[in-house]
Amino acid sequence: MENVFDYEDIQLIPAKCIVNSRSECDTSVRLGGHTFKLPVVPANMQTIIDEKLAISLAENGYFYVMHRFEPETRIDFIKDMNARGLFSSISVGVKDEEYEFVRQLAEENLTPEYVTIDIAHGHSNAVIEMIQHLKKHLPDSFVIAGNVGTPEAVRELENAGADATKVGIGPGKVCITKIKTGFGTGGWQLAALRWCAKAASKPIIADGGIRTHGDIAKSIRFGATMVMIGSLFAGHEESPGQTIEKDGKLYKEYFGSASEFQKGEKKNVEGKKMHVAHKGSIKDTLIEMEQDLQSSISYAGGTKLNAIRNVDYVIVKNSIFNGDKY
């Protein structure tokens, strides 16, 4: 592996601008059978997404992935989304009951448009077998498989039938995999994304380590089609986490998917909990992300997201923040 770097080590280099206003730039992206307003998706975590927010995102032209931590609600969720004329996008694990769940969907003629196989270490036979099971019983579902961190994993999951792969092992803010296990892409997530994207023939979703809106543009530069984001989406009015008041300020809970708070027990814990300052409406954040990405496209010298993929970059090893807290 040559050139190991992360988001804060990279600056993209501007190309000649061809628009009069950034509002001329189009941030939309196609994934599966739909086109979405932004190449961004809130993480499929319990404190980030719930049914209500999923409906709102789908109605407004954004992608979402429902989490898998209330498995018994998934069938009703798919039916509800279908009744509303919206796309359904769910997560599954790889345990035996998930195989039964997929068979049940097929029997009831329920085909979610998107199914994400959501496992911490996605380069495994368990995931490959679940991809094959999904493709057999729900051939029309768009299958996203993850999470992975190597080109070999991307190739194997694609060959098994995955329609997209999700890249990122432990770079998230409430993920402590790197500390608990010594493994992962924390600290070099952007380089891992680049490495994986070179091997991919299907879309890649970058997952974890995004701390600023500029990191979305950097993810696209290095091969992501879609960018999954947790902490930047935590703490909004619409976020499912509990609201807490501390010293007159409002905060919301945000915890990792393998944390004891999510599991209800202290066993194989690879996530932690934090309190995030209350940020107002998620709609405002999505609009700001869109405007910032429009600016990124204008700096890239284009009118569409793809322009970002062609820009030059430099590696600034002392970090672009110069030690300042952003």
From Swiss-Prot:
NADP(+) binds at residues 204-227. One of its GO terms (biological process) is purine nucleotide metabolic process. The active site is at residue 175. GO terms for molecular function: GMP reductase activity. It comes from Bacillus subtilis (strain 168). Keywords: NADP, Oxidoreductase. Belongs to the IMPDH/GMPR family. GuaC type 2 subfamily. This is GMP reductase. Induction: Expression is regulated by PurR. GO terms for cellular component: GMP reductase complex. It catalyses: IMP + NH4(+) + NADP(+) = GMP + NADPH + 2 H(+).
